[in-house]
Amino acid sequence: MTENQPATAPAPVSLTEAFWYWFRLGFISFGGPTGQIAIMHHDLVETKRWISERRFLHALNYCMVLPGPEATQLAAYIGWMMHKTRGGIIAGTLFFLPSLFILIALSWIYMAYGNVPAVAGILYGVKPAVTAIVVFAAYRIGSRALKNAVLWSIAAAAFIAIFAFDVPFPYIVLAAGVIGYLGGRIAPDKFATGGGHGAAGRNYGAALIDDATPTPPHALFTWGRFARVLVLSLALWAGVMALLFARYGWEHALTQMGWFFTKAALLTFGGAYAVLPYVYQGGVEQYQWLTATQMIDGLALGETTPGPLIMVVTFIGFVGGWTRQLFGPESLFLAGSVAALVVTYFTFLPSFVFIFLGAPLIETTHGNLKFTSPLTGITAAVVGVVLNLAAFFAYHVLWPQGFSGAFEWLPAVIGIAAFAALWRYKTGIIPVIAACGAAGLLYTLIKPLAGA
């Protein structure tokens, strides 16, 4: 420790002080999981010193192997470490709560005024930007995950399976996990994770939860606590599901949304982009809660709001409730809002369960190849699945009338420019979407003047 680094830990943090920090974070957590984790690292490790870098990375590596939004889980994990279950619930909920209300408002504007020429023009430019963002996501995941020919082969097989044969996403995840498990036993060097997020390399001074701080009693694994959390978690899930079933029946959209997004929450290995193909298969093709175009627009809204990207499910729920007119044509906003709340509840409940129930168990298997090699296989498959999602988006953006219709040259140019900005010039996602939306609006305004 250098002379510029504090030798004493900061004073204990009250639950109220922590509450206001998590509340503020929920409004500024832009930039996807990478940006959100960077914000928390700067605030909690470097500035406030609530937790040491080593303990921060230790928690992050746990969250990375769980299904669900890792930044949300990291917030819940740190909140739980500091202030027990109450702290975890507060931290995790406030991380996505602002974006929930923002997306409900934006979804209402979209459904009520989406056909207004100015709004349609902005969306015309945003759609190819979203396609470029998904392609870039596949590139980023692939560059990190595909370290050898075996993993490249898994990614290619996953792409062919979903693109050519329309294999459901859960089967692809299951097959990739089995291949990863067997591969870890046969060729462990091909399925090693490479150390997750690495070891701590810097010391910012003594922290409240420091490297040598003992694990607090509430974070230690006991079978009694495990059983209590498990029973309560099942009750929270089954209680709401039973209420929906008793009130509306199994075939009602709200009940189906609860069941579908529970399954989706358990399949989000690799982040939100990984689960989007599954959500597309269910939301667009199977249940027809929204159209392909609406899903692209929803992803754009999700990219431009704070909170985890998986909050796009809130938009899907709102649009599904609105279009199905669940409570009649006079209550479209109410129907959309209730559906959005149902979807969000069932999407995020498993994340809290994994933290409160699974963190002590995951700690015992952290770094064990038998545990991590299936995740390596799944991550490789995710690359192929996300690339298929990009192809799906590109088809609907560039050939809106199908291959028999005209090719849209302007969206192609906008999409290429957006990808170049992301890849070559490291431009942020929000500026890219804003610029592409402005280009689409400008085109819409000048098109009538040009007589096109």
Where are the language model's segments positioned?
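Multi-pass membrane proteins that catalyze or facilitate reactions on polyprenyl-/lipid-phosphate substrates
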Residues: 1-66, 77-305, 309-452
